[in-house]
Amino acid sequence: MTQSTDYKEPVSILNREEITFSVEAETSHTEVFMSEVHSKPKIIDNAWETICSYPSLLKAHENARKGKRYRAEVLGFTARLEDYLLQVRDKLLDGSHELGPYRKLWVSIPKKRLVMALPYMDRIVQWAIYQYINPIFDKMMIEDSYACRVHKGSHKAAHKLQYWMRQVDRKPGDGWYYLKLDISKFFYRVDHEVLLRILGRKITDKRLMDCLRGIVNSRAEPFGLPKGKSPQEVPPGEWLYEVGMPIGNLTSQMFANIYLNELDQYCKHKLRIHYYVRYMDDIVILGKTKEELKTVLESVRHFLSEELHLELNKKTCIRPVRCGLEFVGLRITTKRIKLRKSTTMRIKKEFKGICDKYSDGRLNKEAFERRVASLKGLMIHADTRKLKDRLNGIYLRAIAKKQEKEGQKREDGRYSGTGGQSE
């Protein structure tokens, strides 16, 4: 089930003026309708034509190209934007759209995993679906779910957890404990049937569900792994079709939150847990005693197994709050939030590498400053004064070395006669 990434000239009985008038009228109608749709949680029905409308796809294109607008496939699509968006719309409405082939890339930071990316046209389709249904599902989620949500994020999750750790640390008694839940190979083990059943409780639009089913149950590409296996351990022919989501898909982030919202609701409303924080598949629960958290752990383990067909791995643990813990890539205690040692070492190594490339002329100033800013962003919400001082020294030495080399080049040009008047 693959599709060429070449875009064809759309066939239409309308001339250019009629198309423009139709698009403008459709834009006005859709903006009003979508504002009504997102005004409150509801059953999602009769949504497909709005999702596939020109203004919806145009907004999806604007979202999909952020940070990627100068890539060849994006430039090619943008060059004939209106024609291509109309073509996408027609394919979605007549049911002829099929997912294109995934591009695969192995990444090793922070750990080795397989990232998959769809062709640009399919990313637009996913954005169109996401921007319509995600706000509706988001209203069903608990306050303390922090991944891939507006006004949330990993740093807010870290600060909320630290706030609660400080609260319980002041309570009388022998000291509280935390339960850190680690779901085994979460993205590779999501059960398609369970996910579609959860989506189907809220979505009654048949064409929308058919499209989501095509994204989840891709027959062209398996996303799942056998229990206990890592991506690099499983040969291509042994990947599973009935479980798993592609890391890199926008919809996978949304599906992950929707899937684990079932656990959130169970913990908050059935087990009545107050101190509960989740960032994607990283979950921390605070409890008065180790015995209390052991009971919670068994209840959660049973729910995950029976309802979501997931398992916890050996990293799941119960320890005293006073010992601190690692969460969202940070080391959190009641007093400080620090980077993990592995993160600190990675930043040092990467920073030195880009500084060396810049001083040697292998990296231009714009790219250099952009990558430096990216690394600074990793440190902004943690106590990293010593690390910043060390990196600042490396940075200044790189700048000085670059200026020295540029000055030497000017001197060489001047004395060789290339920079002065000829005799």
Regions found by a protein language model. Give the residues of each.
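Right-hand nucleic-acid polymerase module
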Residues: 1-35, 118, 127, 232-242, ...
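Hydrophobic alpha-helical membrane-insertion signals
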Residues: 38-83
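Short Gly/Ser/Thr- and Asp/Glu-enriched loop/turn motifs at secondary-structure junctions
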Residues: 100-102, 277-281, 313-315
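Short, conserved non-catalytic motifs in the polymerase core
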Residues: 67-75, 100-126, 140-153, 219-257
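Conserved polymerase palm-domain catalytic core
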Residues: 84, 91, 164, 168-280, ...
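Active-site-proximal segment of RNA-dependent polymerases
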Residues: 47, 133-188
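Amphipathic alpha-helical blocks
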Residues: 78-98
